[in-house]
């Protein structure tokens, strides 16, 4: 087909002829020239076609460049993989001078991508980035400038940005999400492969670009590389210690000849090293006074130079960063404002007026030096003067004051608990008022008791007993030594009072004991201290007995009529015809236990009403008031005998009283046994005659109301205090048997047994009994072991019995006046022995004690047999 009919005569067809000569080049169809005199050799301006105003459909309407192959070769970039001109392509000249040409294949590639055309990594990353840009722009359509701003950290070159703008010129101001995916694909290919993107690259998959790490160095100043060590240096032994190779040797067991070395590429960073000079120079600080003097001398020598210097200083501005003294000197040198600084601060002299004023105020200037602070207010005046740095003037023979330095005193401890240390110091000063020696040495801190005042009272009550005229200097000299810390009891004051009153066992009863006894026997509250004052029983009254003082209010009403000189006596201190006498010839092998911390079943047998005693057991406490008030409104022998006859305590009633004991007692016998018990009771006259016949039947051991817990005097000894106390704790366990319902009704009957707790209810010890009787008694005791096993085992833990001499009871000077009351008391003793016989300790080392134990055991066996009618 020929296009010659289009040729119009008269027109310049040179361009067309040239185009016809090149049909074989394959640059396009035959040229149809619409040239109207435009110079085609001139470079085409980018403003010839309004690229921004064209839409996506206008891409086919492009200006065709029909130039030679040289112009077509310039359309492609040097870095582009395709070096041939695309057939039927589009050639564009960018503003940077590069020519961009789009082939028909490029024109067929869409500028948008769907999610199906992306990889999973691209979808996940590009969607996140798109949402980030939308959040910043507050819209769903983004611009290319927003994308480039978001990709600032990727360091895109300007050529890449221009090429992408040229490709997406139709939608550069409004990119949807598909076009955004296409833009990022071209950006990733340009960043990773370092080429200018083309339109056809949109369909090619590309990895996701990763930004430059923040911590990475721009120029890679430091590079760590492995360097092999030289064998020659290793052989010489001059190499440094390589901790990395040593660590690898410990971990892997192999030695490595490589080490990591840091190599700095940038020369600027190589020079930055800290170097220490081996030569250290010292320079004295400048002396300002010397400089000023030198300057003044120089100015005197050269006054013209001084004026010039002043002029230069006046003209130059002040440097306010100078130190204050130099700045003041500069201001003084200027002398422009005389009111600001008249003279140098160091050169100001005191005037005569100022000197006179200071002389007048000299006395008042030292007023505030003697003010006592909070710390010095509690110190004596001498220490205050020492603290303020002054010395005390002391006058000597010539009346001249010589300063004397007093030694510093150590800090004294402050008692945070009770006032033990304070009272102890005051008490010691009262005991030793004439101690002229002043202890100036450092004293150790003394312990302060945070509990009760046991240690305090113990130390103060022991001091009067140990003070002797000859021992005064010894106490003074020993007080300066280091004393070990002494324990302080945090419980009750029982152990304290026991230790202080127990040394008075062998002393006669003093008037103080008489006064305490008479005052305390008139009220039920003071029954405990009455037994404290006895020579043998030194249990104190507990501080916790106050809640139980009102247990028996009826006793307090009847008690004033019950006081009788024949019957108000304690265990070892008795009132005989109005006189208080002690039991004669009572030997104590040990003192009494340290504390009254026995269980509840044992506290009913103590000699002072303690805190854990029920009401039905309190009637058996060892107090004359509790003994006689309920059973004896009037103390007469006939009335006492009738009362005791009516209130004979059966084993059942006794078992009621002992319901708190840990030992398992036998169950109460049937009522028929009680009737047999009444028939088997020996009359008081017969019992009293038996007591008269037996010389060694002496009330030696107190009957603590059917309790086997306290059977020996060693139980109350301070030497065995800890052992006895812990044994009593270990042996105590609550009784599984409940309290019978008739416990309250037996209270009156139990009170009659309280008299026996006053007396010494150990049975008569016959010294003439043989060893065969002891063997028989042991056999019988084994039969009773299951019944009274707990009692016998605990009794054997406390060796020792109280004995009197074998002399006749009538031959003793302090024989108690029994009468009918004595018969009654011994009858109750016999009855209580029948119910709960007390065993003696078999573990006594002395032979006499063993013999006494044999006799007591035999007597108990006889009492048991009489009780159960096994022997006529």
UniProtKB/Swiss-Prot annotation:
Renumbered ranges of motif KKRVK motif: 272-276
Mapped Sequence repeat ranges: 405-424, 439-458, 479-498, 534-545, 564-575, 593-604, 608-619, 623-634, 636-647, 650-661, 683-694, 717-728
GO function terms (MF aspect): protein phosphatase 1 binding
Modified residues annotated as Phosphothreonine in this record: 416, 450, 490
Keyword Lipid metabolism: no
Keyword field contains Membrane: yes
Record's comment on post-translational modification: Phosphorylation by PRK1 and/or AKL1 on Thr-416, Thr-450 and Thr-490 of repeats 1-1, 1-2 and/or 1-3 negatively regulates SCD5 function in endocytosis and actin cytoskeleton organization.
Phosphoserine found at: 564
Primary location group: membrane
Ranges for region 9 X 12 AA approximate repeats: 534-728
Annotated region (Disordered), positions in chain: 1-98, 209-239, 280-321, 338-358, 460-489, 516-571, 591-620, 649-681, 697-758, 806-838
Compartmental location: Membrane
GO BP, sorted A to Z: cortical actin cytoskeleton organization; endocytosis; positive regulation of clathrin-dependent endocytosis; protein secretion
GO cellular component: actin cortical patch; membrane; nucleus
Keywords: Endocytosis, Membrane, Phosphoprotein, Protein transport, Repeat, Transport
Membrane topology, record value: Peripheral membrane protein
Subunit and partners: Interacts (via KKVRF motif) with phosphatase GLC7.
Other notes: Present with 704 molecules/cell in log phase SD medium.
Purpose of the protein: Regulates both fluid phase and receptor-mediated endocytosis. Involved in vesicular transport at a late stage of the secretory pathway. Regulates actin cytoskeleton organization.
Protein name: Protein SCD5
Gene name in the database record: SCD5
